[in-house]
């Protein structure tokens, strides 16, 4: 360990172990997954916090050998055991791109595109342009780089092949191969009644395909082929949201499908159910009528939905009348 720390120091990285880890130091071969919490701090006397993964509810995951945009993180985590807590003071040369990486991580935490504002422009060029990153603290750090301290708590180290990669960590080829597998896992979970978990699987599969689709010209044959793969996954996701009673999300997604594919029976049916659930009776009836127009064989199912809607409306009308009678009787 002393030799390791000495080599880090020669490269402009000072390591201070706060809590010893467990077992032997992993070999960290390519494909190893390190899961850790981090805090990024200014290196001045105040040591104020710039970013803290614990405030985002999810630890950082790094795959060794995937050319993470902040190479120093791979360097330092590869010196740590599971359970270890350490601080690393890193020279400017190692952290000049931190503002860009931090922006991406913040976007991910907020559910945004991690590449928002960074397309078609390399990191170094952006640094020279001094374009705003949308965060005052990162803008200041970009314009006046300084050494940074990374406080790392290593939670888990997993060898290649012992874990399922997150979509963001996959190559394009890995994403394409993973989609059918993730799709089937989602179907299995849904059949077993694990609706929330199934929705997460469908979401991951959609994320893989959306990432691939972003690299294609909109409307091109490859783009359309990917979109045709996304649609059934999105419909499955909507089914999960119907069960979870998240009706407005169903309305949004089904409408987006129908804007492109106006003959999609399943999208009309699910949107009709969502409209019915939020008391949009006319819209529900219109969607169910479209279902019958496109597939008359579904008449029994549609009739059942319409009867259920009529019953709910009648009950609601009776409840409203009773409520109004109570108001005016006082």
From Swiss-Prot:
Superkingdom of the source species: Eukaryota
Signal peptide: none
GO cellular component: aryl hydrocarbon receptor complex; cytosol; membrane; plasma membrane
Residue ranges constituting the PPIase FKBP-type domain according to the UniProt record: 31-121
Keywords: Cytoplasm, Phosphoprotein, Repeat, TPR repeat
Subcellular location: Cytoplasm
Pfam entry (one): PPIase_AIP
Entry annotated with the keyword Cytoplasm: yes
Keyword Zinc tagged: no
Predominant place of localization: cytoplasm
GO-annotated molecular function: aryl hydrocarbon receptor binding; GAF domain binding; peptidyl-prolyl cis-trans isomerase activity; transcription coregulator activity; unfolded protein binding
Modification type Phosphoserine: residues: 43
Residue windows of the TPR repeats: 179-212, 231-264, 265-298
GO BP of this protein: protein maturation; protein targeting to mitochondrion; xenobiotic metabolic process
Subunit structure: Interacts with RET in the pituitary gland; this interaction prevents the formation of the AIP-survivin complex.
Function text: May play a positive role in AHR-mediated (aromatic hydrocarbon receptor) signaling, possibly by influencing its receptivity for ligand and/or its nuclear targeting.
Name assigned to this protein: AH receptor-interacting protein
Source species of the chain: Mus musculus
Encoding gene per record: Aip
């Amino acid at each position: 360990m002393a030799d390791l720390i000495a080599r880090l120091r020669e490269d402009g990285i000072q390591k201070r172990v706060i809590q010893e880890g467990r077992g032997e130091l992993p070999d960290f071969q390519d494909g190893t997954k390190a899961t850790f919490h981090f805090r990024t701090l200014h290196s001045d006397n105040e040591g104020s916090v710039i970013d803290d993964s614990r405030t985002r509810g999810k630890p950082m995951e790094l795959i060794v050998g995937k050319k993470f945009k902040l190479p120093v993180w791979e360097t330092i985590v590869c010196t740590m055991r599971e359970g270890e807590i350490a601080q690393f003071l890193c020279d400017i040369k190692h952290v000049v791109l931190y503002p860009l990486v931090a922006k991406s991580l913040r976007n991910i935490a907020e559910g945004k595109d991690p590449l928002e504002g960074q397309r078609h422009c390399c990191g170094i060029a952006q640094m020279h342009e001094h374009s705003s990153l949308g965060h005052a603290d990162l803008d200041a750090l970009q314009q006046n780089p300084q050494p940074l301290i990374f406080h790392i708590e290593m939670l888990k180290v997993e060898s290649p092949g012992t874990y399922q990669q997150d979509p963001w960590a996959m190559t394009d080829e890995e994403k394409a191969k993973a989609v059918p597998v993730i799709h089937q896992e989602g179907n299995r979970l849904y059949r077993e009644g694990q609706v929330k978990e199934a929705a997460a699987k469908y979401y991951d599969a959609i994320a893989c395909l959306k990432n691939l689709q972003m690299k294609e010209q909109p409307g091109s044959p490859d783009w359309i082929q990917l979109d045709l793969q996304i649609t059934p996954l999105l419909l499955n996701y909507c089914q999960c949201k119907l069960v979870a009673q998240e009706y407005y999300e169903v309305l949004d997604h089904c409408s987006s499908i129908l804007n492109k594919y106006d003959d999609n029976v399943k999208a009309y049916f699910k949107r009709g159910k969502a409209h019915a659930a939020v008391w949009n009776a006319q819209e529900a009836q219109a969607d169910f009528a479209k279902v019958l127009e496109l597939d008359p064989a579904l008449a029994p199912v549609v009739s059942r939905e319409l009867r259920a809607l009529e019953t709910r409306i009648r009950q609601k009308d009776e409840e409203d009348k009773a409520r109004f009678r109570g108001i005016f009787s006082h």
